Amino acid sequence: MTGFATIQTDHKIFLRACAALRPEDWDGQEAPLKAVDAEGWEHISKLAVQFGLLGLVARNLGWANERTGVAIPVLARMTVWRQGQLMQMLAHRKAARRIGEALTAAGIRFVVFKGMALVDAVYGDLSLRAFRDCDIFVDRVRLEPAYAILQDLGYSLALHESLQDYLVRDKAGANMSHSDGSSVDLHWAIQGYEMGPSDPEIIWRHCRPPEPSQGLPGWRMSPELTLINVAAHYQVHEYEEFKSLVDFYLTAVKLGGRIDIDELFKTLQVLNMRQTVDIAARLCQRFFIPNPLVERLAAGPPSLHARLACRILTEKSLLRLDKIRPTERRLRGLICSGAVASSARAFRKMLLPKARELELRFGRSFDLGMYPKYYIVQAYRLFGRTRKPFSDLA
């Protein structure tokens, strides 16, 4: 774990608690565990809650306590919280099953991926990883029927008024929420920084029909595409959601034996996602317990871009409790992820948007008054640290 020695002690314990797979992974950790003071344990607890890793960290700290005998002041409280989280996840899973059964009954082919699928295939325990949405991917030609079914189940669009509003803005998915607190992300494309809206056939070629042992209806991504997708998700969120890096690491560990490395590299080439996975693997190599697949993916000297990304994405920048400004986050994502050409295009789009781009931003026909309003809104988002989307402020 290159550079691990320079990481502060409470962060070291948090990172091990994210990566431990068995009680024995805490052997030899008595000294760093004892070095964490009360404030440090509170910090670890807050990180676990903020990144949706409360259950995983609580279980693994329980192992640490059992294996080393070191007292962990926040463990009892985190264990109670983990039980409460389990009840929430059971409710979300019930809602997801209702959605899956309705789509299946209508003969609509769909893929369940991200949080819900990772809990089944990687974590194996609903209490370990929190998720908010049920993410499903459908064929574009079946999008409207799938949307209608979700409406019939009581789900409504969370941001725009109609599905067409998402389509004209070149979105890849739409979030829909229910009065019972559940929500679903309906996707018709999968994309990343360097990957435009995906050719559906490429995605479907790497998905598998449901198996009888699955807890939920719906197709699943192959192990190779699952690993790629969690890396893409980490990148798309400009490296702010640390849970996605943990997803990547644990997917590599748990599904590594089923991943065809040649097929993985071939798919990375087709989707233009090699750099994305390379950076995720190098961060895992730095922070987590060594793993053969991670080492293979991070082998060789890093590219100039990967070297720059890893210098920017330090443990302190990734494990921060305060939210960074949206524009600051976007700039970090562009510097760390985009190729030179795409980064230049993105910076131009941010600083000098074209008429069509402003139309998509404002949702109406272009007029010159959009330019001053665009810069005022962006300045407010930058200096006001607001988390609201542009459309809510325009």
Regions found by a protein language model. Name each.
Residues 2-132, 138-394:
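Conserved NTP-donor binding/palm subdomain of two-metal-ion nucleotidyltransferases/polymerases, i.e.
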